[in-house]
Amino acid sequence: MKLQKLYSKVRQALDDYNMITENDKIAIGVSGGKDSLTLLYALSGIRSFYPVPFELVAIAVDLGYEDFDLSPVKALCDELSVEFYVVKTDIGRISLEKSKNQASPCSWCAKLRKGALNDFALSFGCNKIAYAHHMDDIIETMFLSLLYEGQFYSFAPVTQLDGSGLTIIRPLMYVGESDVKGFKNKYNLPVCKNPCPYDGHTRREYVKQLVRQLNMENPGVKKRLFSAIQNGNIDDWVKCTKPSDTS
């Protein structure tokens, strides 16, 4: 995917759901993966021509695993003129301890990681956090909710975090994972290998393969599934209805 196409899709999401307002200070949660680096690239570029000014900082939560080198990410942030910070934690070890009787520590890890990111973002005066969830993530979350919770749900474009004053935005919501992979390859993004021993062995990975198979057998099914989520009256989505749709 070319840079201008990425800008176009991200700009559409920002505008459709009023994700950015004047003088926002936005923290990008950077994991070193292709998704967060693509989001970093997109928002840092859009910042130069967006109609309202906003600030960016990039924050990586180090889970405490060995051999996790974020220096290439630091170099990219320097190139893009984005401040970069690393939060050192023992979340990897803590998650394993707390989940001894569970299939995997992923839910604990996600909860603790988000908490660390939120706290650090607040300490730097940020009022918003940009997550790098793309269209496929939104669809996969819907399937996870259906299969394992019996509910039709997926996370929304904009989410207000009660009590913290933080707002979560998802600017990659119109970008498919295949486009993210294409952008990563075209621009040689410095992806860091995920050191987590559970990487690729989760329910989400199972659902990812399921959606991929469905789309192979029924071309275009992902776009139809995404449309169903947009139009499905999910509570969190109704709360952030596009401004153009309000009366």
Regions found by a protein language model. Name each.
Residues 220-247:
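A short, charged, Gly/Pro-tolerant segment at domain boundaries
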Residues 1-142, 148-151, 178-186:
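ATP-dependent adenylation/nucleotidyltransferase module used to activate substrates
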Residues 109-121, 158-164, 211, 215-230:
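Short, basic, helix/turn surface patches
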Residues 3, 110, 200-203, 207, ...:
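Generic structural signal for well-ordered, non-membrane alpha-helical segments
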Residues 95-98, 203-204, 234-235:
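Short, solvent-exposed polar/charged micro-motifs at secondary-structure junctions
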Residues 56, 137-216:
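Catalytic subdomain that performs nucleotidyl-dependent activation
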Residues 17, 46, 50, 214-217, ...:
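Solvent-exposed amphipathic alpha-helical surface segments
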Residues 63-65, 91-93, 159-162, 175, ...:
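Residue-level detector of flexible, active-site-proximal loop/helix-junction positions
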